C-alpha cells in the first residue's frame, strides 16, 4: 500500500465549485472499522479518484466524474499504512454511464463491473440498493477518505464518517443556479453548516436506513458552509437501470 504521505504528495486536485472528486468528510470523526464494509477507494499511483460502494460481489457504484485511467479499486481498507488481511484489490472490467462524463450537475453515476468477484469478509460486504426514496428529514450517514478541512486540505489516514439529513431539494436549488428541480438528485447536509462531504469523498455513499440512497456528487468549493448543502445522485431513480445492467441487459435505457 502506498504510504499516505506519498499519496497526498501525488494527488492531482481538480477544484471547482461543482466537483468533489477528491473530497473528504468535514466535521466527522474516524469511522468504526466495522461500519464501512461496503466502502471502496478508487485511485492509482498518482491520483485519488474518490470512493464507491460495493453493491454485490461483482459490482461497485460510484460517480461518473470519478472515472480515471489505470484506476484500482481497494476494498476492505481502513488505515493507509496498516492494510488489514481482508484488503482486496480489483480493477474495472466494464464501466457503464448515464451521461456525458464531462458534466456532473445531473446523472452523475458510474456502475463498475469488477474483473473478478470479491470475497465477503469481516471488513467487506455489499450495501443494499434502496427499496424506496428517502424522505426529507431522514437521518443519513456519509463516509470517505476526503479532506477533513476546507478550504485548506488535510487528508486523513483513515476514513471519516458523519451524520447528515435529507433536506428540501429547493434549498439546493437556491444555493446552486445550475441545479434544476427536475434533476435526479438529493439535497443533503446540515443547514447551519459544519458537516459535509468534501474533496476525496466523491462517489462514496449517502446511507439512509441501511441502504445506499445517494452518491456523493458535488457542492460548494468550500465545504461545510451554511445553506450550501451537498448534492447527491439519487440512487433510487436508477435502480431499474442498475438491475438491468447487472442482469446482462447492457442496452438498458437510463432514466430521462
Curated annotation (Swiss-Prot):
The keyword Transport does not apply. It holds the Pfam family Trypsin. Its EC number is 3.4.21.-. One of its GO terms (cellular component) is secretory granule. Disulfide bonds join 31-161, 98-254, 140-208, 172-187, 198-223. Residues 1-18 form the signal peptide. Residues 25-247 form the Peptidase S1 domain. Residues 19-24 form a propeptide. GO terms for biological process: proteolysis. Glycans are attached at residues 44, 119-120, 152. GO terms for molecular function: serine-type endopeptidase activity; toxin activity. PROSITE patterns: TRYPSIN_DOM, TRYPSIN_HIS, TRYPSIN_SER. It is found in: Secreted. Expressed by the venom gland. InterPro entries: Peptidase_S1_PA (IPR009003), Peptidase_S1_PA_chymotrypsin (IPR043504), Peptidase_S1A (IPR001314), Trypsin_dom (IPR001254), TRYPSIN_HIS (IPR018114), TRYPSIN_SER (IPR033116). The keyword Isomerase does not apply. Keywords: Blood coagulation cascade activating toxin, Disulfide bond, Glycoprotein, Hemostasis impairing toxin, Hydrolase, Platelet aggregation activating toxin, Protease, Secreted, Serine protease, Signal, Toxin, Zymogen. The active site is at 65 (charge relay system), 108 (charge relay system), 202 (charge relay system). Its platelets aggregating activity is inhibited by chlorpromazine, theophylline mepacrine. Its platelet aggregating activity and its amidolytic activity are inhibited by PMSF, TPCK, TLCK and soybean trypsin inhibitors. Is unaffected by hirudin or by antithrombin-III in the presence of heparin. Thrombin-like snake venom serine protease which potently induces platelet aggregation and has fibrinogenolytic activities. Clots purified fibrinogen and hydrolyzes alpha-chains (FGA). High concentrations of this enzyme also cleave prothrombin (F2) and factor X (F10). Is also able to activate factor XIII (F8). Monomer. Belongs to the peptidase S1 family. Snake venom subfamily. This is Thrombin-like enzyme cerastocytin. It comes from Cerastes cerastes (Horned desert viper). The lineage of its organism: Eukaryota, Metazoa, Chordata, Craniata, Vertebrata.
Amino acid at each position: 500500500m502506498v504510504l499516505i504521505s506519498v499519496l497526498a504528495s501525488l494527488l492531482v486536485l481538480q477544484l471547482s465549485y461543482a466537483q468533489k472528486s477528491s473530497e473528504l468528510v468535514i466535521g466527522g470523526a474516524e469511522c468504526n472499522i466495522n461500519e464501512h464494509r461496503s466502502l471502496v477507494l478508487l485511485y492509482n499511483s498518482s491520483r485519488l479518484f474518490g470512493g464507491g460502494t460495493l453493491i454485490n460481489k461483482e459490482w461497485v457504484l460510484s460517480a461518473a466524474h470519478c472515472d480515471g485511467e489505470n484506476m484500482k479499486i481497494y476494498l476492505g481498507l481502513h488505515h493507509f499504512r496498516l492494510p488489514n488481511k481482508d484488503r482486496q484489490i480489483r480493477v474495472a472490467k466494464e464501466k457503464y454511464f448515464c451521461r456525458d462524463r464531462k458534466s456532473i450537475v445531473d446523472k452523475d453515476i458510474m456502475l463498475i463491473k469488477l474483473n473478478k468477484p470479491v470475497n465477503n469478509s469481516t471488513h467487506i460486504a455489499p450495501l443494499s440498493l434502496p427499496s424506496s426514496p428517502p424522505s426529507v428529514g431522514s437521518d443519513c450517514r456519509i463516509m470517505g477518505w476526503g479532506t477533513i478541512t476546507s478550504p485548506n486540505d488535510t487528508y486523513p489516514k483513515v476514513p471519516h464518517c458523519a451524520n447528515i439529513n435529507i433536506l428540501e431539494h429547493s434549498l439546493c436549488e437556491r444555493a446552486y443556479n445550475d441545479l434544476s428541480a427536475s434533476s435526479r438528485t438529493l439535497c443533503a447536509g446540515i443547514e447551519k453548516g459544519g458537516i459535509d462531504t468534501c474533496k476525496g469523498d466523491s462517489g462514496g455513499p449517502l446511507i439512509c436506513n441501511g441502504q445506499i440512497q445517494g452518491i456523493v456528487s458535488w457542492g460548494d468549493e468550500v465545504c461545510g458552509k451554511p445553506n450550501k448543502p451537498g448534492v447527491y445522485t439519487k440512487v433510487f431513480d436508477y435502480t431499474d437501470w442498475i438491475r438491468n445492467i447487472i442482469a446482462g441487459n447492457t442496452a438498458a435505457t437510463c432514466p430521462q
